[in-house]
Design a protein with these regions (language model features):
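RNase H catalytic domain
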Residues: 5-11, 163-249
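RNase H-like nuclease fold core
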Residues: 6, 10-12, 16-157, 169-172, ...
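Charged, low-complexity intrinsically disordered terminal regions and linker tails
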Residues: 32, 58-66, 222-227, 231, ...
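Aromatic- and glycine-enriched pocket-lining scaffold segments that form the walls
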Residues: 97-99, 247, 251
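Loop-to-helix element that buttresses phosphate recognition and phosphoryl-transfer chemistry
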Residues: 158, 162
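Acidic, His- and aromatic-enriched active-site or binding-groove loops in soluble protein domains
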Residues: 207-213, 253-274
Length: 274
């Protein structure tokens, strides 16, 4: 049986970057959809309780599954940036952390406080091979975008990067899911992915921030849709509405503040048998 763990795909190359979304200006782009809760009064962790999923080719694994539709799962994302804004130290660059939660502990729905992942991952490292991968993955935002250009860290970018990492982490369509719901407390992410993106393209972007990540995200959404898996976004107004948001936010903050090896280049994280 294949060993479980987190592995890095080769860093992105400029020549392999996604098609620029300006190519869509003559066609109608189909953005992601908004998730409408089946029961609006339920907290996300009640609407998507942790359930054990069985599959013929691997051990049972936990996922946050919609109690009203067993073909839908929840992924929770967040990001944090330190040393930015007017109160930041102008002598030091901003440092951002990203995090996403894709499963929990069967006894408590959430793992104990997660430790940030340290780059680089090495499958030959004995500590790596013996690690127990928790359900929340946290990491430092890279210093380059998917097109290879240097970027400045911001909290918006960190959260957007977390969405991409979460959607790329597992082949969700191959697991059999027909909808992946992204839970976040940032309207910029939800409105951008579901409403604003076609407008930005129509207006020629006009120096819109994080264009590289928005193009990367839309490409992933279209790929999953082509495999019969829809991506939807669910906005909660603050972390107190959901334990999921609070725990994922804490992991992102920890990643931003923890000293460690940073990745320069934009890198895909792959969860194997998790």
């Amino acid at each position: 049986m294949e060993r479980s763990g987190i592995y890095m795909a080769p860093p992105y190359q400029k020549s392999g970057s996604r098609r620029r979304l300006s190519d869509h200006r003559g066609t109608k782009l189909q953005p992601a959809t908004l998730f409408v809760p089946n029961a609006p009064n339920l907290a996300p962790e009640v609407h998507f309780p942790l359930q054990t999923v069985s599959a013929p080719d691997r051990p049972p694994y936990p996922r946050f599954v919609n109690r009203f539709d067993s073909r839908e799962i929840l992924l929770v994302v967040d990001g944090s940036c330190v040393n930015n804004g007017r109160h930041g130290n102008k002598c030091e660059p901003p440092v951002a952390g990203c995090s996403f939660t894709f499963k929990g502990n069967p006894t408590s729905s959430l793992d104990p406080a997660p430790q940030p992942v340290t780059f680089p991952f090495r499958s030959t490292d004995p500590d790596f091979n013996n690690q127990v991968v928790k359900g929340t993955i946290a990491f430092r935002l890279e210093r380059e975008g998917p097109l290879g250009q240097p970027i400045e860290h911001t909290s918006n970018r960190a959260k957007l990067r977390a969405v991409i990492a979460a959607l790329q982490f597992r082949p969700w369509d191959a697991e059999g899911w027909r909808r992946v719901v992204i839970l976040t407390d940032l309207e910029y992410i939800v409105s951008g992915a579901t409403t604003w993106l076609p407008r930005w393209i129509k207006r020629g972007w006009r120096k819109r921030a994080n264009r590289d990540l928005w193009e990367e995200l839309q490409g992933i959404i279209e790929e999953l849709r082509s495999r019969k898996c829809e991506v939807s976004f669910w906005l909660v107004t603050n972390e107190f509405e959901s334990q999921f948001i609070g725990r994922t936010k804490a992991a992102a903050r920890s990643a931003a503040r923890t000293e460690g090896v940073e990745m320069e280049k934009f890198t895909k994280l792959c969860g194997i048998m998790l």
